């Protein structure tokens, strides 16, 4: 199984300079990058189509020259009512185009979630997602990009604090059901291991539920309470079960890390990343 890393994991040390991130990935021996377009410092929405194409084609060519490819991107996400706006829809369409310019196969997308204590029913939320993604399908087909719905959580205020709230799409059977309802060869799933652990779901079982619709991964550990984005074996996830699950469904994608910087010290963090990938290599042998 190939390994990769999210550009978000490197962004604090390179001021989100995508070319420097490629150099870092090469030094780490990583051959795949998950480009975080939701946090990009390049304004791909408000430049011309030609300019955006030139930028991401140049980035792709630089990556290829260094033995690296962009296996997936991450689209922007927002809250209600922003995701009902034409502006947000156009941003996602532009993200699909930029994903294509990078020659990346997949774009990770957060399902749309209505706010806590709203008057919306779950069925309305499901239909909202179906309608939104159906509007995207012509663009996904035109640019040959596959959308991967990620298992997510949301937030709510409790006793003056913002705390994690599990939602419909925190649970594997619900996410798979949504994908089945859309029923398109261009729509699949991204498994976020930390989010699944927060939902107290068995990740092996989740992988089996996702099965052939599991196309991309966000790999990180946690203790099941906070979204720690920690390296493997530093939380409570059973990584051998994760490996076995991926093998059992014949997963051939990228084992892509999405871990937070562990220190503000640049050299220390790069050393920590090297150690993180040693753990990955040991697991996947």
Question: Model-derived features: where do they sit?
Answer:
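Glycine-rich, proline-tolerant flexible connector loops at the mouths of alpha/beta enzymes
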Residues: 34-58, 117
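Active-site acidic/histidine proton-transfer and metal-coordination neighborhood
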Residues: 56-58, 62-66, 81-188, 198
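Short glycine-enriched, charge-decorated loop/helix-capping segments at active-site entrances
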Residues: 45-50, 123, 164-165, 229-233
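Conserved beta-strand positions in the central sheet of alpha/beta enzyme cores
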Residues: 34, 72, 108, 148, ...
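Conserved radical SAM core fold
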Residues: 37-43, 79-80, 113-117, 154-156, ...
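Short, well-ordered beta-to-alpha junction loops that form the rim of enzyme active sites
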Residues: 75, 110-112, 150-153, 193, ...
């Amino acid at each position: 199984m190939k390994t990769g890393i999210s550009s978000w994991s490197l962004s604090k040390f390179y001021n989100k300079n995508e070319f420097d991130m490629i150099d870092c990935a090469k030094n780490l021996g990583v051959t795949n990058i998950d480009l975080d377009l939701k946090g990009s410092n390049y304004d791909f929405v408000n430049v011309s189509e030609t300019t955006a194409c030139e930028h991401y084609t140049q980035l792709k060519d630089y990556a290829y020259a260094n033995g690296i490819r962009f296996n997936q991107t991450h689209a922007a996400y927002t809250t209600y009512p922003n995701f009902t706006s034409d502006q947000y829809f156009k941003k996602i369409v532009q993200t699909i185009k930029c994903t294509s310019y990078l020659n990346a196969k997949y774009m990770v997308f957060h399902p749309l979630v209505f706010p806590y204590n709203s008057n919306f029913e779950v069925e309305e939320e499901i239909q909202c997602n179906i309608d939104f993604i159906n509007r995207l399908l012509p663009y996904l087909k035109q640019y040959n990009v596959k959308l991967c719905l990620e298992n997510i959580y949301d937030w709510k205020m409790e006793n003056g604090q913002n705390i994690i709230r599990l939602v419909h799409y925190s649970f594997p059977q619900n996410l798979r059901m949504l994908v089945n309802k859309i029923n398109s060869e261009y729509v699949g799933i991204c498994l976020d291991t930390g989010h699944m652990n927060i939902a107290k779901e068995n990740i092996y079982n989740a992988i089996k539920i996702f099965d052939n619709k599991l196309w991309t991964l966000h790999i990180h550990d946690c203790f099941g309470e906070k979204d720690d984005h920690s390296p493997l074996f530093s939380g409570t996830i059973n990584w051998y079960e994760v490996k076995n699950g991926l093998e059992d469904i014949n997963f051939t994608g990228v084992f892509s890390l999405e871990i937070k910087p562990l220190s503000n010290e640049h050299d220390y963090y790069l050393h920590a990343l090297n150690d993180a990938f040693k753990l990955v290599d040991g697991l996947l042998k």
